[in-house]
Structures are given as structure tokens and as C-alpha cells.
A protein has these predicted regions:
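Short beta-strand elements bearing conserved aromatic residues within extracellular beta-rich modules
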Residues: 121-123
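Low-complexity, disordered linker/stalk regions enriched in Pro/Thr/Ser/Gly
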Residues: 1-56, 61-64
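Short beta-strand-plus-loop segments that form exposed binding edges in beta-rich domains
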Residues: 164-171
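Short, surface-exposed tryptophan/glycine-enriched loops
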Residues: 146-160
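Surface-exposed loop/edge segments in extracytoplasmic proteins
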Residues: 2-7, 130-137
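Disordered, acidic Ser/Thr/Pro-rich linker "stalks" and the adjacent N-terminal cap
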Residues: 37-99, 110-117, 131, 140-146, ...
Length: 190
């Protein structure tokens, strides 16, 4: 239904568990009608079944790989920096627990400082966690604390995801990641 005076009136937050398209506009007796705004939302995905299956290194005591999927933007995965100085690239692989059709992913860099924020990256998807093929997307993240969304040219079906850091924003050898999430359009298994 198109927004209009007879459409359902917004009266508070509502669940959009399966994602969808939301159209909104403002109407009133003593105001001009607004233009229609449209936003598409992905499937709401629980991380209960997610697990990190591989990270090439981590900093003991603060940079555990599980922090990249714990939903807390203040925690982070950080590759080892106090012992060895393993150079880029660095990577993390995640089992989503179920197959999904993905249209993209989101990245949240470290919030409390710049150290380890990813600059150049590659993102892969796999059905079995072994055959990764070519990257779905290669790109460069902005050096900030904002959530960054990356969309794919076409949807992909997978159960495993892999983020590879090719470089760090200051040129350092280590990597950090506050949160990674998926933009799913379909849940294919339960």
C-alpha cells in the first residue's frame, strides 16, 4: 500500500523479522504532504548459531575472535601485536550455522581507537567452509567508527563467510574488527 491519509498510521516500533520494504510519508491538515521515503530492510538474523571457525591470530586477553560477532561494539577481535609481528593479510572465518541468501554485509571498525581498523579488504562466501572461490567483493573501508554496509552485485547463498584484511588504515601489520554482520534476504534452513 502506498503511503497516504488512509494508510496505516505509524504509532510506534514494529517487528520486521523477515525484512521488507517500508514506505513512509507525513500528512496533516495544516501542513504540506511530504514526499514518500522508502527503505528496504534485510532479514533479522540471530547470531545464536554463529561461531568463529578460524582467525589467523589474536591478541590474548583482549582481542579474541569471538568479539567480532558478540554484538558488543566496544569489544573487538585483534590480531596478535604484543608477540609476533605477523604481516597482512589477516582473516576471520565465521560459520553462520544455517544457509542464507545474502545481499551484503556490514563492518564496524574498532570504536575506542584507530589501531587495526581495516583499510583494504576482500569478502568471501562458501557453502562448505572449504571452497571459497573468488572474492564476492573487494573494497576499502572508511577510517571511522560508523557502521559501513557493503552490497553485492547479486545475492549469494552460503553458510560461511570470510573477511580478509589486506591493509590497515595506518599501514600497521595488525588488524582489528569490532563487529561483522550479514545482510540476509532469505533464511534457507532451520
Amino acid at each position: 500500500m502506498e503511503p497516504g491519509p488512509s494508510a496505516r498510521r505509524y504509532d510506534g516500533p514494529f517487528a520486521l523479522i523477515d525484512g521488507g520494504l517500508v514506505k513512509a510519508a507525513a500528512f496533516g491538515e495544516q501542513m504540506l504532504d511530504s514526499s514518500v521515503s522508502t527503505a528496504r530492510f534485510g532479514l533479522l538474523v540471530s547470531r545464536d548459531k554463529w561461531k568463529v571457525v578460524y582467525a589467523d591470530s589474536f591478541e590474548p586477553g583482549e582481542g579474541y575472535p569471538r568479539h567480532a560477532i558478540d554484538g558488543d561494539p566496544e569489544t573487538f577481535w585483534h590480531t596478535n601485536w604484543s608477540g609476533s609481528k605477523e604481516p597482512q593479510p589477516h582473516e576471520i572465518q565465521i560459520d553462520l550455522g544455517l544457509k542464507f541468501e545474502l545481499s551484503g554485509f556490514t563492518y564496524l571498525g574498532r570504536q575506542n581507537q584507530v589501531n587495526g581498523r581495516i583499510r583494504d579488504y576482500e569478502f568471501y562466501a562458501s557453502s562448505d567452509g572449504k571452497d571459497w572461490g573468488e572474492p564476492l567483493v573487494k573494497g576499502r573501508f572508511d577510517n571511522n567508527t560508523s557502521l559501513q554496509r557493503v552490497s553485492f552485485d547479486k545475492p549469494v547463498v552460503c553458510r560461511y563467510i570470510r573477511l580478509v584484511s589486506l591493509s590497515e588504515v595506518t599501514g600497521a601489520y595488525y588488524t582489528s574488527l569490532a563487529e561483522i554482520d550479514i545482510v540476509a534476504t532469505k533464511r534457507l534452513e532451520d
